[in-house]
Amino acid sequence: FLGGLMKAFPAIICAVTKKC
């Protein structure tokens, strides 16, 4: 679970803050 979360986190931040 944690591995998947760490994988998805950057994409979520990118989508929310528009900062990649």
Curated annotation (Swiss-Prot):
Tissue occurrence: Expressed by the skin glands.
Q: List the disulfide bonds.
A: C14-C20
Query: Which Pfam families does UniProt cross-reference here?
Result: Antimicrobial_1
Q: Which domain of life is it from?
A: Eukaryota
A cellular-component GO term for this protein: extracellular region
Record protein name field:
Ranalexin-1Cb
Q: Which biological process terms from the Gene Ontology are attached to this UniProt entry?
A: defense response to bacterium; defense response to fungus; killing of cells of another organism
Q: Which family does it belong to?
A: Belongs to the frog skin active peptide (FSAP) family. Brevinin subfamily.
Q: Keywords assigned by UniProt?
A: Amphibian defense peptide, Antibiotic, Antimicrobial, Disulfide bond, Fungicide, Secreted
Function (record text): Antibacterial activity against Gram-positive bacterium S.aureus and Gram-negative bacterium E.coli. Has activity against C.albicans.
Q: Where in the cell is it found?
A: Secreted
